[in-house]
Regions:
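Membrane-interface helix-loop-helix regions
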Residues: 1-37, 69-97, 161-175
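Alpha-helical transmembrane segments in multi-pass integral membrane proteins
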Residues: 15-20, 46-50, 90-225
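Glycine-rich loops and low-complexity Gly/Arg-rich segments
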Residues: 30-32, 58-59, 223-224
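Hydrophobic alpha-helical membrane-insertion segments
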Residues: 1, 63, 197-198
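Small-polar-interrupted transmembrane alpha-helices in polytopic inner-membrane proteins
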Residues: 54-74, 133-141
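Feature marks short, surface-exposed loop/turn motifs that line or immediately flank catalytic pockets
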Residues: 10-12, 65, 206
């Protein structure tokens, strides 16, 4: 299991430890890095040769996959058992057909949209771009889950709106802006530390979950501390 984690290769479902269906039970977030590594391999071999037109076609198709997932259109008939996460983009960390579809859907649009933005080089230049981008990200992420029952689709529409429109806009603004002074060192530090933190934080969560399950009767303040 540890060797598979080192290589980002998915583990067999029968090796699952907690019943969460993770591709690697020792470090859950490796599922997303597995998809990223696969995308980078395909880019090195084939995708880097795509024309702008071809990239545009893939962006359109991957946008459809995003809508299919977020709005639960279920064109491929894979999401019938996904009631727990309906009208969200949650999932992608297992090797079952539905989870593979979710993982691919979550990967492709950001990947191809980013490539197309880079290729056409149409960046948005704004003053204080760092702060505007930070404000937009914060505003989008603090929004609660929208809708329940018959209106649950609103949450899926919001997720699709963020993924298909707002996030590319923020990336374009960020790439077209620059920082100066002390902000350069701050941004550089957080940019360099974000990836290592992402791949190392989840084992700490596993330990916290295990500790909490064995100390359920302790006061809430103890769990928070």
């Amino acid at each position: 299991m540890m060797l598979l984690g080192f290589t980002m290769l998915p583990a067999l479902s029968k090796w699952d430890i907690r019943g969460w269906g993770e591709t690697n039970a020792l470090n859950g977030p490796t599922w997303s890095l597995m998809w990223e590594y696969l995308a980078n391999i395909l880019y090195a071999l084939f995708i880097r040769h795509f024309s702008k037109t071809m990239l545009g076609i893939f962006v359109a198709f991957s946008a459809f996959l995003t809508l299919n997932l977020a709005l639960n259109l279920d064109v491929f008939g894979l999401f019938s058992t996904r009631s727990y996460a309906i009208y969200t983009v949650i999932g992608g960390w297992s090797t079952t057909p539905d989870q593979l579809c979710i993982g691919i859907s979550r990967l492709l649009y950001p990947f191809f949209a980013g490539l197309l933005l880079s290729r056409i080089n149409k960046l948005i230049k704004v003053k204080a771009g760092f702060w505007w981008c930070s404000l937009l990200v914060a505003a989008l992420l603090v929004a609660p889950h929208f809708g329940t029952g018959d209106t649950a689709w609103i949450n899926g529409a919001y997720d699709a709106f963020c993924i298909l429109l707002m996030f590319p806009l923020i990336v374009s603004m960020g790439a077209g802006s620059s920082v100066t002074g002390r902000s350069v060192k701050v941004c550089k530090f957080f940019g360099e530390i974000s990836y290592p933190l992402y791949i190392t934080h989840y084992p700490l969560i596993y330990m916290q979950v295990a500790w909490a399950s064995h100390h359920k009767d302790l006061p809430l303040g103890t769990h928070i501390c």
